[in-house]
């Protein structure tokens, strides 16, 4: 398995719709102001957060159970930025829609700009033939409220191409998050 370059990412995005919308360069400024960068980098793609958030709250004092998750644990919020309470988290989704080729696996890592502020972005790998908007998890590890920005970079996707095609893809096995459209809560 080898990591793929900016040239490969551009070619795949433009010819197969692997990433939509796609930014072929690296954007660091908008409307004359500095932003957290997004777009194609040397060996990855910096994804953006959409203005759609689910902020975790403890108002119902419930147990967090991934097999029986209570939707009332979240407050829905739409906006250009989102404040995450201390020691809490928020879910969001990418602006970009992904279509992963059958011989490719991705790993997604948080951007250091957020990590240096105690905000950790967690995303699982995008498996072969998975497609959809990516659900993002932002953890605020600080004792203070933390701000995240919609429309700006939040994580980097690295693409790895296998030397052979997998026998069973995410699509083949009917993966439960296939084709997700919005912020998607846990499914057992």
Swiss-Prot record:
DCTP binds at residues 111-116, 135-137, 156, 170, 180. Gene3D superfamilies: 2.70.40.10. It holds the Pfam family DCD. The keyword Transport does not apply. Keywords: Hydrolase, Nucleotide metabolism, Nucleotide-binding. GO terms for biological process: dUMP biosynthetic process; dUTP biosynthetic process; nucleobase-containing small molecule interconversion. GO terms for molecular function: dCTP deaminase activity; nucleotide binding. Coiled coil: none annotated. The keyword Nucleotide-binding applies. It is an enzyme of class 3 (hydrolase). It comes from the Bacteria. The active site is at residue 137. Its EC number is 3.5.4.13. It catalyses: dCTP + H2O + H(+) = dUTP + NH4(+). Pathway: Pyrimidine metabolism; dUMP biosynthesis; dUMP from dCTP (dUTP route): step 1/2. Homotrimer. Catalyzes the deamination of dCTP to dUTP. Belongs to the dCTP deaminase family. This is dCTP deaminase. It comes from Polaromonas sp. (strain JS666 / ATCC BAA-500). The gene is dcd.
């Amino acid at each position: 398995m080898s990591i793929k370059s900016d040239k490969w990412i551009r070619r795949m995005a433009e010819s197969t719709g692997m990433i939509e919308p796609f930014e072929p360069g690296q954007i660091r400024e908008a409307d004359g102001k500095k932003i957290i960068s997004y777009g194609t980098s040397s060996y990855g793609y910096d994804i953006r957060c959409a203005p759609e958030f689910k902020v975790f709250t403890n108002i119902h004092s419930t147990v967090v159970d991934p097999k029986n998750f209570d939707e009332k644990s979240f407050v829905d919020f739409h906006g250009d930025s989102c404040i995450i309470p201390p020691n809490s988290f928020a879910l969001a989704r990418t602006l970009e829609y992904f279509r992963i080729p059958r011989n490719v696996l991705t790993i997604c890592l948080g951007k250091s700009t957020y990590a240096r502020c105690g905000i950790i972005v967690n995303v699982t790998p995008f498996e072969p033939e998975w497609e959809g908007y990516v659900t993002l998890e932002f953890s605020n590890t600080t004792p203070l409220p933390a701000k995240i920005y919609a429309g700006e970079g939040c994580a980097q996707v690295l693409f790895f191409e296998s030397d052979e095609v997998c026998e069973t893809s995410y699509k083949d096995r009917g993966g439960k998050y296939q084709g997700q459209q919005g912020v998607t809560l846990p499914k057992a």
